[in-house]
Curated annotation (Swiss-Prot):
Known EC number: 2.1.3.15
Family under the similarity heading: Belongs to the AccD/PCCB family.
Domain called CoA carboxyltransferase N-terminal: residue spans: 28-280
Binding annotation for Zn(2+): C32, C35, C50, C53
Reaction it catalyzes: N(6)-carboxybiotinyl-L-lysyl-[protein] + acetyl-CoA = N(6)-biotinyl-L-lysyl-[protein] + malonyl-CoA
InterPro entries: AcCoA_carboxyl_beta, Acetyl_CoA_COase_Trfase_b_su, ClpP/crotonase-like_dom_sf, COA_CT_N
Gene designation per UniProt: accD
Function summary: Component of the acetyl coenzyme A carboxylase (ACC) complex. Biotin carboxylase (BC) catalyzes the carboxylation of biotin on its carrier protein (BCCP) and then the CO(2) group is transferred by the transcarboxylase to acetyl-CoA to form malonyl-CoA.
Protein name: Acetyl-coenzyme A carboxylase carboxyl transferase subunit beta
Alphabetically ordered keywords of this record: ATP-binding, Cytoplasm, Fatty acid biosynthesis, Fatty acid metabolism, Lipid biosynthesis, Lipid metabolism, Metal-binding, Nucleotide-binding, Transferase, Zinc, Zinc-finger
Names of the cofactor(s): Zn(2+)
A Pfam entry, by short name: Carboxyl_trans
Compartment(s) of residence: Cytoplasm
The organism of origin for this protein: Leuconostoc mesenteroides subsp. mesenteroides (strain ATCC 8293 / DSM 20343 / BCRC 11652 / CCM 1803 / JCM 6124 / NCDO 523 / NBRC 100496 / NCIMB 8023 / NCTC 12954 / NRRL B-1118 / 37Y)
Amino acid sequence: MDLYNNKNSDTSKIKRDASVNDRIPDGLFLACPYCGAQMYNKQLGKYRVCAKCNYGFRLQAWERVELLTKNFEEMDSDIQMDHPEFPGYAEKLKRAQSQTELAESVLTGTADIEGEQVALGIMDSYFMMGSLGSMTGEKITRLFEYATAHTLPVVLFTASGGARMQEGIDSLMQMAKVSAAVAAHQEAKLLYLVVLTDPTTGGVTASFAMQGDVTLAEPHALVGFAGARVIESTIHEKLPKDFQRVETLLENGFVDQIVPRSELAQLIAKIVRLHTAEAE
């Protein structure tokens, strides 16, 4: 206390080291979007889950591949389209491609998951919010067509904000296009396994996200069609807290099982093996 009480003390000799950065780096601490718990970034671990509620933080497609398999062969990586003349659309696409190392909002290919060969699709919410564009629909359609031709099960991780508004009706048509490919795959008595991740909304929810033979989900993932605020403004009522969370969907029969991210690969392989044995 003498330092503060002594008016004659010389504090001018205390100098700040200019080489030291006293600013807290961005992203060092995070708040869980579901429970609000504050945590150190490294506490999330390799699976990127909240230690308190097990909510799975959003992953990029390539990050999820690393968690699922060591053997992945990408398909249609060079797919392109003539972009509609929507102001700024081409620039947004280029920026998203640079940030995610993807050509479109879905990564597709074949993979070995715990010894089981599957056709794998992973939507990426970091690519324009995982929006469903015409090339997204084309890639998913081709994935199902390939799987049908090669008698492979399809495993699709959904994550989307809905149809891509910049493409108008072309985007909306992808719902029907992918659904037709799903139907042909199921007609061949092949397995289609969906994993709902946060967020899965809009046209994706209204079509192929809800057409799987088995529907799994990550804890506390947001799944719905319209946003909660849109619904509330329409019906003029306050919605329940977990109205569009997968826990509510599970209670009402829309989801078969909620699975921690660390257990997904093993469970997917087990389901594929059971289906293969049944088919034989």
